[in-house]
Amino acid sequence: MSFFDIEAQSSKGNSQQEPQFSTNQKTKELSNLIETFAEQSRVLEKECTKIGSKRDSKELRYKIETELIPNCTSVRDKIESNILIHQNGKLSADFKNLKTKYQSLQQSYNQRKSLFPLKTPISPGTSKERKDIHPRTEAVRQDPESSYISIKVNEQSPLLHNEGQHQLQLQEEQEQQQQGLSQEELDFQTIIHQERSQQIGRIHTAVQEVNAIFHQLGSLVKEQGEQVTTIDENISHLHDNMQNANKQLTRADQHQRDRNKCGKVTLIIIIVVCMVVLLAVLS
């Protein structure tokens, strides 16, 4: 092989490795994008849970609508425009699940935003209204020569306005307290609802685990029952085999005894014949 052939093979191998390296690099970049999308979705989910709670505010909703949701949408569009997402089954399945979760987060945010609108705080009355509430009095001198000054009370502002102002302030304080209590009760009910949902989820998971354990126990009991049945059948077969063996041994013993009897009779006959022949010869 010449030097040029070796160079041609090495260049061919390098040309085959370059596309593979490029594909692996693109796949890694796509995986990083999916991880970024998952992380931003988790941040969005965490911030959406604050809607309707004490930490809810205009700044929070502005951040969700102008920063978190657009960032997630931008990363999602980048992933969808990547060709490799349709060629890699695992990454495609992960992205599909994240995309479905992101859509549900958007719907949840819109629902919570409409369910918990932000309330504007009650502002105190203007200075003009407060001036109207206070009784207006003016000092007049009835007699220029007299040193006494009489107070003239305006008919449109009786002295009872002080009590009315106090009642109005009490009413405003009560309304503010009621609104604060209603918001606290709403937050408390929301927290209780979330905790109950989590408890129900945990109970459901525990029930599923218990069902799985009972299913496994049922399978084990069934297997043990089959094994016990097999052992019982084997014991029955062994008992039958032992009985058959005892019968065969009894028959063999009886047959051996019969053969021994026949041998003894034959031996006696032979002895008698020999004695008769011997006596005949001697006589």
From Swiss-Prot:
<keyword id="KW-0926">Vacuole</keyword>
<feature type="region of interest" description="Disordered">
    <location>
        <begin position="162"/>
        <end position="182"/>
    </location>
</feature>
<feature type="coiled-coil region">
    <location>
        <begin position="28"/>
        <end position="48"/>
    </location>
</feature>
<dbReference type="GO" id="GO:0034727">
    <property type="term" value="P:piecemeal microautophagy of the nucleus"/>
</dbReference>
<feature type="transmembrane region" description="Helical; Anchor for type IV membrane protein">
    <location>
        <begin position="262"/>
        <end position="282"/>
    </location>
</feature>
<dbReference type="GO" id="GO:0051469">
    <property type="term" value="P:vesicle fusion with vacuole"/>
</dbReference>
<dbReference type="GO" id="GO:0042144">
    <property type="term" value="P:vacuole fusion, non-autophagic"/>
</dbReference>
<feature type="topological domain" description="Cytoplasmic">
    <location>
        <begin position="1"/>
        <end position="261"/>
    </location>
</feature>
<dbReference type="Pfam" id="PF14523">
    <property type="entry name" value="Syntaxin_2"/>
</dbReference>
<keyword id="KW-1133">Transmembrane helix</keyword>
<feature type="domain" description="t-SNARE coiled-coil homology">
    <location>
        <begin position="190"/>
        <end position="252"/>
    </location>
</feature>
<comment type="similarity">
    <text>Belongs to the syntaxin family.</text>
</comment>
<feature type="coiled-coil region">
    <location>
        <begin position="169"/>
        <end position="189"/>
    </location>
</feature>
<dbReference type="InterPro" id="IPR000727">
    <property type="entry name" value="T_SNARE_dom"/>
</dbReference>
<keyword id="KW-0072">Autophagy</keyword>
<dbReference type="GO" id="GO:0048278">
    <property type="term" value="P:vesicle docking"/>
</dbReference>
<dbReference type="InterPro" id="IPR006012">
    <property type="entry name" value="Syntaxin/epimorphin_CS"/>
</dbReference>
<protein>
    <recommendedName>
        <fullName>Syntaxin VAM3</fullName>
    </recommendedName>
</protein>
<dbReference type="GO" id="GO:0031201">
    <property type="term" value="C:SNARE complex"/>
</dbReference>
<dbReference type="Pfam" id="PF05739">
    <property type="entry name" value="SNARE"/>
</dbReference>
<dbReference type="GO" id="GO:0007036">
    <property type="term" value="P:vacuolar calcium ion homeostasis"/>
</dbReference>
<dbReference type="InterPro" id="IPR010989">
    <property type="entry name" value="SNARE"/>
</dbReference>
<comment type="subunit">
    <text>Associates with VAM7.</text>
</comment>
<dbReference type="GO" id="GO:0097352">
    <property type="term" value="P:autophagosome maturation"/>
</dbReference>
<keyword id="KW-0812">Transmembrane</keyword>
<dbReference type="GO" id="GO:0005774">
    <property type="term" value="C:vacuolar membrane"/>
</dbReference>
<dbReference type="GO" id="GO:0000329">
    <property type="term" value="C:fungal-type vacuole membrane"/>
</dbReference>
<keyword id="KW-0175">Coiled coil</keyword>
<dbReference type="GO" id="GO:0000149">
    <property type="term" value="F:SNARE binding"/>
</dbReference>
<dbReference type="InterPro" id="IPR045242">
    <property type="entry name" value="Syntaxin"/>
</dbReference>
<feature type="topological domain" description="Vacuolar">
    <location>
        <position position="283"/>
    </location>
</feature>
<feature type="region of interest" description="Disordered">
    <location>
        <begin position="1"/>
        <end position="26"/>
    </location>
</feature>
<dbReference type="GO" id="GO:0005484">
    <property type="term" value="F:SNAP receptor activity"/>
</dbReference>
<dbReference type="GO" id="GO:0000421">
    <property type="term" value="C:autophagosome membrane"/>
</dbReference>
<dbReference type="GO" id="GO:0006886">
    <property type="term" value="P:intracellular protein transport"/>
</dbReference>
<dbReference type="GO" id="GO:0006906">
    <property type="term" value="P:vesicle fusion"/>
</dbReference>
<feature type="coiled-coil region">
    <location>
        <begin position="84"/>
        <end position="111"/>
    </location>
</feature>
<dbReference type="GO" id="GO:0061911">
    <property type="term" value="P:amphisome-lysosome fusion"/>
</dbReference>
<keyword id="KW-0472">Membrane</keyword>
<feature type="compositionally biased region" description="Polar residues">
    <location>
        <begin position="8"/>
        <end position="25"/>
    </location>
</feature>
<dbReference type="GO" id="GO:0012505">
    <property type="term" value="C:endomembrane system"/>
</dbReference>
<feature type="region of interest" description="Disordered">
    <location>
        <begin position="116"/>
        <end position="146"/>
    </location>
</feature>
